[in-house]
Structure formats: C-alpha cells, structure tokens
Amino acid sequence: MVDKRESYTKEDLIASGRSELFGAGGPPLPSGNMLMMDRVVKMTEDGGKYDKGFVEAELDINPDLWFFSCHFIGDPVMPGCLGLDAMWQLVGFYLGWLGGEGKGRALGVGEVKFSGQVLPTAKKVSYRIHFKRVINRKLVMGVADGEVLVDGEVIYTASDLKVGLFKDTAAF
C-alpha cells in the first residue's frame, strides 16, 4: 500500500530507506549520509513546468554535515554530484509515490549546469523537480528537469534526469 501524501518528514524519508513507506516492492531512498534531503514539502501529479508532476524537497545546511570536513580541507563546499544525486533520488521517490515497484537506478541526464555552490554558511538547499514524462509499463521510468537552489537562488540545473525502476538488477 502506497503512503501517498503531499509532503513527507525526515522520519518518513528514513522509513522509505527501510522499504516501509511504499511497501516492500517500492523503491527505497538511500539511507544514512546518502539521503540528501530532510523533507519533501510538495508532491503533485500535475503542476510543474510541464503540468505532469512536481516535487519540492529541502535539505537543512549546517557546517557539521559530513561532506564539508572532506570536500575540501580549508575550502568546504558540498560536492555538486550530491545535488545531482538528490535530484535522481527525488525522481525515484516520485515513481514510488505513483505506485511504481522495483529498485531505482539513475539512467542518465541530458545536461547539468553549475552556477553556484553550497557553502557551510548556507541555511537551506531546495530541490525542484518538474516531470516531463512518466512511463509505467514493463519499464517504469521518469524523465524530469530539476533545479537546486541555495537560500532561494538557483545554483544547478539539470535537464532530462532519467530514473528507472527495476525488479531485477542482476543484469543492469
């Protein structure tokens, strides 16, 4: 049974990592340090730039986050790939929210642009995912554009984020 709401807390997202939110067949989010959001503030089946679905999530920033101590010593910055991964995580989460089953795998991205950075002095990172297409046949796949914002300013954009759900990943 899919727990389908408009918003989710950190505890809900952690439960997703244990396959407790969307059922045993639903795609789990990463757990621990690789979970790149603290809450999902909005999910809709319509809306967004293409009126085919929208997700908005947030990550609270503080200087004690794990990546600031190692990326880089004396020049702490959140790795851009973590923001990209967060967008892929949200595409997979949305597919589970729609009732899709399987293990999520990032399948690609058309283009990524970085125009800013997340420093330990920031307060909040926001992610916005605008769905272009959802395929729900033998293959379950989402295609979306995304934005990463720091304290309200867009700093990364990604086009054609692709995530698929796979019931068997052995041949992946």
Swiss-Prot record:
Pfam families: FabA. GO terms for molecular function: (3R)-hydroxyacyl-[acyl-carrier-protein] dehydratase activity; trans-2-decenoyl-acyl-carrier-protein isomerase activity. Its main location: cytoplasm. HAMAP family: FabA (MF_00405). The active site is at H71. Necessary for the introduction of cis unsaturation into fatty acids. Catalyzes the dehydration of (3R)-3-hydroxydecanoyl-ACP to E-(2)-decenoyl-ACP and then its isomerization to Z-(3)-decenoyl-ACP. Can catalyze the dehydratase reaction for beta-hydroxyacyl-ACPs with saturated chain lengths up to 16:0, being most active on intermediate chain length. Keywords: Cytoplasm, Fatty acid biosynthesis, Fatty acid metabolism, Isomerase, Lipid biosynthesis, Lipid metabolism, Lyase. GO terms for biological process: unsaturated fatty acid biosynthetic process. SUPFAM superfamilies: Thioesterase/thiol ester dehydrase-isomerase (SSF54637). The gene is fabA. It catalyses: a (3R)-hydroxyacyl-[ACP] = a (2E)-enoyl-[ACP] + H2O; (3R)-hydroxydecanoyl-[ACP] = (2E)-decenoyl-[ACP] + H2O; (2E)-decenoyl-[ACP] = (3Z)-decenoyl-[ACP]. Belongs to the thioester dehydratase family. FabA subfamily. Its EC number is 4.2.1.59, 5.3.3.14. InterPro entries: FabA, FabA_FabZ, HotDog_dom_sf. Homodimer. It is found in: Cytoplasm. GO terms for cellular component: cytoplasm. Pathway: Lipid metabolism; fatty acid biosynthesis. This is 3-hydroxydecanoyl-[acyl-carrier-protein] dehydratase. The keyword Cytoplasm applies.
